[in-house]
UniProtKB/Swiss-Prot annotation:
InterPro entries: AAA+_ATPase (IPR003593), ATP-dep_Clp_protease_ClpX (IPR050052), ATPase_AAA_core (IPR003959), Clp_ATPase_C (IPR019489), Clp_protease_ATP-bd_su_ClpX (IPR004487), ClpX_bact (IPR046425), P-loop_NTPase (IPR027417), Znf_CppX_C4 (IPR010603). ATP binds at P122, T123, G124, S125, G126, K127, T128, L129. GO terms for cellular component: HslUV protease complex. Keywords: ATP-binding, Chaperone, Metal-binding, Nucleotide-binding, Zinc. HAMAP family: ClpX. This is ATP-dependent Clp protease ATP-binding subunit ClpX. It comes from Photobacterium profundum (strain SS9). ATP-dependent specificity component of the Clp protease. It directs the protease to specific substrates. Can perform chaperone functions in the absence of ClpP. The gene is clpX.
Length: 426
């Protein structure tokens, strides 16, 4: 390496010893013993080192696979309640990755089947959050798909193969990583066929999509264009083995409780032996979901072959007010903690009183949106405060109580100088 220098009227002009650019062509030139390096070359060196570290990094040891109890404990940190669903998911996920670690066949020649998962639960009960948390914990690629946007190949809409393409995008088209990933397909109940009798008319977004998903979920080698490019037919397609990908399908299945109730009621007998229940003894939706059988899903509109590809079923219960209050306060990424962290960046403390949390939960219950509606309620309550706070001087604390949630008063602003204490804009 030689140090290129050139004398000028104002002194020596310095050059990067690696790329040859002058000090005027770069933002920073770092000096060493008889050599110089510019900021651009430093960035390039860092990129090279990062790539080499990736290549020599030891692959995840199979023994690092967390046990079902460890998976459940991790889910508890982020998802409130749904204990049965967590246990079912923990066992299914553990068995899936154990199968990948040891191969599809045991030493005795027993073939291990693939156990995809069906989540049944009301809107906002935590189906998506459970799937996301699992993927984050296991450090595997994760993608979501909306079943309502999927259509059969050849029709306007999103092809089923696009799901795998999205998964590849999440891991920079690394096929090996994608094959260890998790795919969550939401609103799966929306692709039920319109009746339980096969129709001669084309059901583009119903039974047809179920048929298209069959092979993908069960396991096939999907051909996906690199970078999603169909514009260049000469490019070689990437081959992805979907038998190694864990598929989790979720849906609210509105009306399924009626199907289950009808079956249960039919099986209880008639006349003197009938199981007569009073209004107070009527089963809740959550109770009925726990009794779901494959035949109920068939009657709902899922084809038997599709149900067979989702052998593990986990039902989630409707969240009550107490659970919603816990969701606001307890998880690692609880909403109150998130907004407190946002205001902390302005050096302002945020306090939610207990009665405020109950009021937020009550509003969410009235909207029938479960935990999903909590953020919009909190966002609306704090909108004006977050708008004005960056321009305000001397505010040290914001207090939210029940009256603020109900729109009866403004958030209480506490100033460093208590004499300037004010409520809202007053």
């Amino acid at each position: 390496m030689t140090d290129k220098r050139k004398d000028t009227g104002s002194g020596k002009l310095l050059y990067c010893s690696f790329c040859g650019k002058s000090q005027h062509e770069v933002r920073k030139l770092i000096a060493g013993p008889s050599v110089y390096i510019c900021d651009e070359c430093v960035d390039l060196c860092n990129d090279i080192i990062r790539e080499e570290i990736k290549e020599v990094m030891p692959k995840r040891d199979g023994n690092d696979l967390p046990t079902p109890q460890e998976i459940r404990t991790n889910l508890d940190d982020y998802v409130i309640g749904q204990n049965h669903a967590k246990k079912v998911l923990a066992v299914a996920v553990y068995n899936h990755y154990k199968r990948l670690r040891n191969g599809d066949t045991t030493s005795d020649g027993v073939e291990l089947g693939k156990s995809n998962i069906l989540l049944i639960g009301p809107t906002g009960s935590g189906k998506t959050l459970l799937a996301e948390t699992l993927a984050r914990m296991l450090d595997v690629p994760f993608t979501m798909a909306d079943a309502t946007t999927l259509t059969e190949a050849g029709y306007v809409g999103e092809d089923v193969e696009n799901i795998i393409q999205k998964l590849l995008q999440k891991c920079d088209y690394d096929v090996a990583k994608a094959e260890r990933g998790i795919v969550y397909i939401d609103e799966i109940d929306k692709i039920s066929r319109k009746s339980d009798n096969p129709s001669i008319t084309r059901d583009v977004s119903g039974e047809g999509v179920q048929q298209a998903l069959l092979k993908l979920i069960e396991g096939t080698v999907a051909s996906v264009p690199p970078q999603g490019g169909r514009k260049h037919p000469q490019q070689e397609f990437l081959q992805v083995d979907t038998s190694k990908i864990l598929f989790i399908c979720g849906g609210a299945f509105a009306g399924l409780d009626k199907v289950v109730e009808q079956r249960v009621a039919t099986g209880t007998g008639i006349g003197f032996s009938a199981d007569v229940r009073s209004k107070s003894e009527e089963r809740t939706i959550s109770d009925l979901f726990k009794k779901v059988e494959p035949e109920d899903l068939v009657k709902y509109g899922l084809i038997p072959e599709f149900i067979g590809r989702l052998p593990v079923t986990a039902t989630l219960t409707e969240l009550d007010q107490e659970a919603l209050v816990k969701i606001l306060r307890e998880p690692k990424n609880a909403l109150t903690k998130q907004y407190a962290a946002l205001l902390e960046l302005e050096n302002v403390e945020l306090e939610f009183r207990d009665d405020a949390l109950v009021a937020i939960a009550h509003k969410a219950m009235a909207r029938k949106t479960g935990a999903r509606g909590l953020r919009s309620i909190v966002e609306a309550v704090l909108l004006d405060t977050m708008y004005e706070l960056p321009s305000a001087v001397g505010v040290s604390k914001v207090v939210i109580d029940e009256s603020v949630i109900n729109g009866e008063s403004e958030p209480l602003l506490i100033y460093e100088n208590t004499e300037n204490q004010a409520a809202g804009a007053e």
